[in-house]
Amino acid sequence: MSELLDLSFLSEEEKDLILSVLQRDEEVRKADEKRIRRLKNELLEIKRKGAKRGSQHYSDRTCARCQESLGRLSPKTNTCRGCNHLVCRDCRIQESNGTWRCKVCAKEIELKKATGDWFYDQKVNRFAYRTGSEIIRMSLRHKPAVSKRETVGQSLLHQTQMGDIWPGRKIIQERQKEPSVLFEVPKLKSGKSALEAESESLDSFTADSDSTSRRDSLDKSGLFPEWKKMSAPKSQVEKETQPGGQNVVFVDEGEMIFKKNTRKILRPSEYTKSVIDLRPEDVVHESGSLGDRSKSVPGLNVDMEEEEEEEDIDHLVKLHRQKLARSSMQSGSSMSTIGSMMSIYSEAGDFGNIFVTGRIAFSLKYEQQTQSLVVHVKECHQLAYADEAKKRSNPYVKTYLLPDKSRQGKRKTSIKRDTINPLYDETLRYEIPESLLAQRTLQFSVWHHGRFGRNTFLGEAEIQMDSWKLDKKLDHCLPLHGKISAESPTGLPSHKGELVVSLKYIPASKTPVGGDRKKSKGGEGGELQVWIKEAKNLTAAKAGGTSDSFVKGYLLPMRNKASKRKTPVMKKTLNPHYNHTFVYNGVRLEDLQHMCLELTVWDREPLASNDFLGGVRLGVGTGISNGEVVDWMDSTGEEVSLWQKMRQYPGSWAEGTLQLRSSMAKQKLGL
């Protein structure tokens, strides 16, 4: 679009003249194309008569063009320097510089000159191939964009300087020059003046007159013949300028300015980083946008630029709980509903007090040819009401092949409104090898689609695929139950993979001084090094059965940018080798008793929020930090032993392989 020209200053008559020129140019081009086709056909005819291909074997006694026998000893034969074929003297064309070519090669050169191909072959390497007529035609079709910060006064002044705005203005001006015509503004029955009534219908009038004039000009050019099929209404300008009309009211030239602006007005919270800088100083100071300005200027704050702020999953869950608590207090109801956040991260949060009832009917079949699991969701029976007072439910079914709970692994049916016995009859597919299917668990969950995305959990059911026979498509019906807690021993296995890490604490006495290492703020304390080696058997988050994973770390209780560390993204693998080290300075040995290292694995999504793949927490696992009970001090098993080994042997590496958690919600401690 950068090649388009600004032709807004042209009048409709001038545009019609330009379009007629373009039409003649199109006719000339078609005639020239016909001439070029004729020349190319002549060349093809010469080749068909006697030319041979380079892939064939040529006899030394035959001319490649006329195929005449040359005899055993023929001094007239020689090789054409264009095609390397043997040709006789009669099939040569002498050139001005004394050299010669065969008839076919000479005809090809002549054709290249006559058609102008030599010019276009060079032009295509230097310029984008687009003729001037195409650019002008596209510019005439293109409607100029309105400046975002152009005021009404500036636009009026610009239009006055550029000339006519709409075609009927000349006719109106001629009518105004006549002394017999009086300009009156009568009152209507509604009490409004005709000018006020006209201004109210200004949007529709402007759209009709503009579209009609544009259609007329393009119909004359013949560029859009299909527009002729559409019946266009008569212009209001023609109606108002007809003789005998009473109380004619003419609209001022600024009518285009007062059209309703469809551009969205941004609230302060919706400004982009660069827009925030352009707000008044009082607004900038109130929002404290020093960090915003540093983000909008490249190189001003490199650390902030590198931080691609994906939301932490626990932080999102915490905010969602607070939001639900506030809404329940305001409504005076103790019933808490679950929002779309729970749809993404189903293991966290409160699932409400709805009593789960009903069952789901379905059938399963595995297609060997396509390597796909076919899930036929048929119907649900006797579901619970999401809104008990109004006896209303809008249910839909969502499925996962656990442990994969990513967006790519989610399948959903349509929403059936105002029913507790929905009939779906829909097919959901999962492309997965049969060998891997036995390690998965198919989960059905039924949800009520509420207003504003506040979905309510209605029940779920699971199928262990290792004990399911898929050779025949049989109908099944399972009862729905409530959410199984992650702490419940009867919970389904959720293997998320393993993370291999090594920890080392270097006391302050052994920490190197000087060099490029930053000095800690406290002036004392050692150094905690976290070596993220690799991950094994991660959950596939992308369609191809892979993940673009990275590890993010926090040294709790500090959950801020100073404590945040990230590894590079390892693409298209479920067994990534990170080989990356996190370093925390200014850490004292006695402080490790009250700290916890949280490592989470994420799948990188460039245009959306990242997918949670699993995580671990390394600490003492007492549930207490600095005398306070905290949720994040919940380490168990290998997480505790690896942390204690690192504390027990300062200066040496402590390595361990940790099972990734499927949820970073608080675990039940064996106290």
Swiss-Prot record:
Binding partners and assembly: Part of a ternary complex containing STX1A and RAB27A. Can bind both dominant negative and dominant active mutants of RAB27A. Binds STXBP1, RAB3A, RAB8A and RAB27B. Interacts with MYO5A.
Species this chain originates from: Homo sapiens (Human)
PROSITE patterns, alphabetized: C2, RABBD
Zinc finger (FYVE-type): 63-105
GO MF, one annotated term: phospholipid binding
Family annotation (Gene3D superfamilies): C2 domain, Zinc/RING finger domain, C3HC4 (zinc finger)
Positions of the RabBD domain: 4-122
SUPFAM superfamilies: C2 domain (Calcium/lipid-binding domain, CaLB), FYVE/PHD zinc finger
A GO biological-process term: positive regulation of exocytosis
Residue ranges of the region described as Disordered: 199-243
UniProt membrane topology term: Peripheral membrane protein
Domain C2 intervals: 356-478, 507-633
Function: Modulates exocytosis of dense-core granules and secretion of hormones in the pancreas and the pituitary. Interacts with vesicles containing negatively charged phospholipids in a Ca(2+)-independent manner.
Location within or outside the cell: Membrane; Cell membrane; Cytoplasmic vesicle, Secretory vesicle membrane
Keywords: Cell membrane, Cytoplasmic vesicle, Membrane, Metal-binding, Phosphoprotein, Repeat, Zinc, Zinc-finger
UniProt protein name: Synaptotagmin-like protein 4
GO cellular component, one term: platelet alpha granule membrane
InterPro entries associated with the record: C2_dom (IPR000008), C2_domain_sf (IPR035892), FYVE_2 (IPR041282), FYVE_Slp4 (IPR044134), Rab_BD (IPR010911), SLP-4/5_C2A (IPR037303), Synaptotagmin (IPR001565), SYTL1-5_C2B (IPR043567)
Gene: SYTL4
PTM annotation (Phosphoserine): residues: 201, 204, 217, 221, 274, 289, 488
Name of a matching Pfam family: FYVE_2
